């Protein structure tokens, strides 16, 4: 067997009969050296020619398109009486059209090159490159080790505008290693189907999430001893939503001139007080004097944020939240009363933020940004399974903002 085909294409068990070159291609005609029964290994067999195969191999120098041609035989073994197709050692499966060596090169290039670029470089179909990577990822992430997992984060991300079940993905990640544990279609309890089997053998102690009742009830049902942490980002976001609702409610009672003025101050109310310029602080002070509900909501928003800044332990945080809720319930602002009820209902999960050393869902939010960037770079994913497999791989690859 010629040495060049062994070291460049990893061809074993075949002898080179002839070769043909053009300006950009090379074709090698191969012949099997010795046939053996794939079941018992006997050489007492009858080989019947079945079909002619042409397989793409790795480029050689200026020959960008390399083909290896050979005849596939059907084998009959006199020893074990078995009938089989002969095994081709340099193919990953019997119907493969490219060699194992070329497959490995393509998968290595996918770390820094797009599917389209690789397809153009090797003169292969885009679909063939995608299916090769999809098969590799499916095999790699078919089983995920979860025995070591102690802390996970659960979050959903909006990924499209299709059917109701296709608009969202629910993602579970190991907060210590960053590995993706589960990717489910949609949001809510239905999206967590399959996650229970994966997490059953884990050493789960803590789960971070937003304040959605669906995730909370699912964890409470299947992992009753696990501590739940409601991410502080979502608590502040919920308060900002209440504040914005007060602003819009107040605007509805104004004339058009006042509405225009207050509409432009939306983000002034949502910003932290210390981040506001002096002129914005003066405008805000005047607005709070003119509209009491809006002023009260802003003050309670800042007070809630200060709890996260100043409280040192879960004990102090619990006292501060109880006081905040008591004062909010004494106001005449319905949005503040609703927020107070929510905090009282979720208080154990909220103060767990201090119990577990300020653990949060921030890594999940950052990971969602990487998913959006991945989607934008690919101009969307038509293959849902391929998209989910790429999410499993995402912690291992770097996403750049350039295409």
Describe every region a protein language model picked out.
Residues 121, 325-403:
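Basic, amphipathic alpha-helical segments enriched in Lys/Arg and hydrophobic/aromatic residues
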Residues 210-213, 220-259, 264, 365:
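Conserved beta-strand -> loop -> alpha-helix junction used to position metal-binding or nucleic-acid-contacting
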Residues 28, 77, 118, 152-157, ...:
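Short, conserved catalytic/metal-binding motifs centered on acidic residues
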Residues 55-152, 156-163, 202-205, 356:
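Short, positively charged, Gly/Tyr-enriched micro-motifs
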Residues 265-332:
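Helix-loop elements that line ligand-binding/catalytic pockets
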Residues 134-218:
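RNase H-like nuclease fold core
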Residues 94-104, 116, 176, 182, ...:
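Acidic, glycine-enriched active-site microenvironments
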Residues 1-88:
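Short, conserved DNA-binding cores of transcription-related domains
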């Amino acid at each position: 067997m010629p040495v060049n085909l062994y070291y460049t294409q990893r061809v074993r068990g075949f002898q080179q009969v002839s070769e043909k070159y053009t300006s950009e291609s090379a074709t090698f005609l191969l012949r099997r050296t010795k046939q053996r029964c794939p079941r018992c290994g006997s050489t007492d067999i009858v080989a019947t020619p079945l079909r002619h195969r042409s397989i793409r191999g790795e480029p050689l120098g200026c020959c960008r398109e390399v083909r290896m041609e050979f005849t596939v035989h059907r084998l009959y073994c006199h020893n074990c009486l078995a009938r089989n197709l002969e095994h081709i050692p340099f193919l990953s499966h019997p119907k493969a059209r490219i060699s194992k060596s070329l497959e490995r090169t393509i998968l290595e290039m996918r770390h820094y090159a797009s599917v389209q670029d690789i397809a153009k470089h090797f003169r292969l179909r885009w679909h063939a490159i995608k299916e090769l990577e999809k098969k590799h990822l499916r095999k790699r992430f078919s089983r995920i080790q979860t025995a070591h997992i102690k802390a996970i984060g659960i979050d959903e991300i909006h990924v499209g505008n299709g059917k109701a079940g296709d608009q969202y993905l629910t993602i579970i990640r190991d907060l210590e290693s960053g590995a993706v544990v589960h990717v489910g279609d949609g949001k809510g309890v239905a999206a967590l189907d399959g996650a229970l089997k994966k997490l059953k053998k884990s050493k789960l102690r803590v789960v971070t999430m937003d304040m959605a009742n669906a995730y909370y009830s699912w964890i409470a049902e299947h992992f009753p001893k696990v501590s739940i942490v409601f991410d502080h980002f979502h608590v502040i976001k919920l308060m900002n939503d209440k504040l914005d609702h007060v602003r819009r409610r107040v605007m509805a009672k104004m004339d058009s001139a006042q509405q225009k003025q207050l509409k432009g101050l939306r983000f002034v109310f949502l910003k932290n007080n210390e981040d506001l310029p002096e002129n914005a602080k003066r405008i805000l002070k005047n607005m709070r004097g003119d509209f009491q509900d809006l002023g009260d909501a802003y003050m309670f928003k800042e007070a809630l944020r200060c709890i996260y800044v100043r409280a040192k332990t879960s004990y102090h945080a619990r006292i501060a939240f109880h006081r905040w809720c008591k004062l909010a319930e004494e106001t005449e602002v319905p949005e503040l009363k609703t927020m107070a009820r929510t905090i009282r209902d979720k208080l154990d999960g909220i103060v767990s933020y201090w119990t577990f050393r300020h653990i949060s869902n921030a890594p999940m939010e950052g990971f969602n940004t990487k998913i959006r960037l991945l989607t934008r770079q690919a101009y969307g994913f038509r293959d849902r399974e391929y998209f989910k497999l790429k999410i499993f791989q995402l912690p291992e690859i770097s996403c750049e903002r350039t295409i």
